[in-house]
Amino acid sequence: MDFLTADLCDEFSDRLQILAPGYASFGGHARFAGRIATLKVFEDNSRVREMLSEPGEGRVLVVDGGGSRRCALVGDQLGALAVRNGWAGIVVYGCIRDSVALGLLPLGVRALATHPLKSVKNGVGERELAVTFDGATFRPGDWLYADEDGVITSPDPLL
């Protein structure tokens, strides 16, 4: 990807939202972009697997995990599933695991931290709704751009 979030902020700041700093990059792609798809879950990644099983078509899955640091919502198996199905990236308001394996995948992954414990699988969660965390609202169909400097969203494509 050939963009810098700093340059996009300079040019389009009036129509952007910026995710608060603190999200580490765990995927093999530090820079990624795509249309947003959303999930709202809490310590249950069943819906994450469901969503990543669908064609990604270059989208970015934004998972509002409530900021939980008690288990991981994404690991190497879900990362590999995302790659197979054409997802550009995953942003998690929560934790991931299998960070070394995720780092080898051609996928963008941002999350608060790592945690070795897997989540429960009770099939609970909501999809394709606006989710807000850490200063930004993520709406299905909006655009997300992530690089080494941060994560931004826009209602319109910027590139």
Swiss-Prot record:
GO MF annotations in UniProt: 4-hydroxy-4-methyl-2-oxoglutarate aldolase activity; metal ion binding; oxaloacetate decarboxylase activity; ribonuclease inhibitor activity
GO biological-process terms attached to the record: regulation of RNA metabolic process
Coiled coil (residue ranges): none
Binding site for a divalent metal cation: 98
Binding residues annotated for substrate, in chain numbering: 75-78, 97
Database matches in Gene3D superfamilies: Ribonuclease E inhibitor RraA/RraA-like (3.50.30.40)
Enzymatic reactions: 4-hydroxy-4-methyl-2-oxoglutarate = 2 pyruvate; oxaloacetate + H(+) = pyruvate + CO2
Listed EC numbers: 4.1.3.17, 4.1.1.112
Cofactor entry: a divalent metal cation
Binding note for cofactor: Divalent metal cation.
CDD domains to which the protein is assigned, alphabetical: RraA_family
Transmembrane portions of the chain: none
Enzyme class: lyase
Keyword terms of this UniProt record: Lyase, Metal-binding
Family statement: Belongs to the class II aldolase/RraA-like family.
NCBIfam families, per database record: NOT-MenG, PRK09372.1
SUBUNIT field: Homotrimer.
Function: Catalyzes the aldol cleavage of 4-hydroxy-4-methyl-2-oxoglutarate (HMG) into 2 molecules of pyruvate. Also contains a secondary oxaloacetate (OAA) decarboxylase activity due to the common pyruvate enolate transition state formed following C-C bond cleavage in the retro-aldol and decarboxylation reactions.
PANTHER family, per the entry: 4-HYDROXY-4-METHYL-2-OXOGLUTARATE ALDOLASE 3-RELATED
Protein name from the UniProt record: Putative 4-hydroxy-4-methyl-2-oxoglutarate aldolase
Taxonomic source organism: Laribacter hongkongensis (strain HLHK9)
Organism phylogeny: Bacteria, Pseudomonadati, Pseudomonadota, Betaproteobacteria, Neisseriales
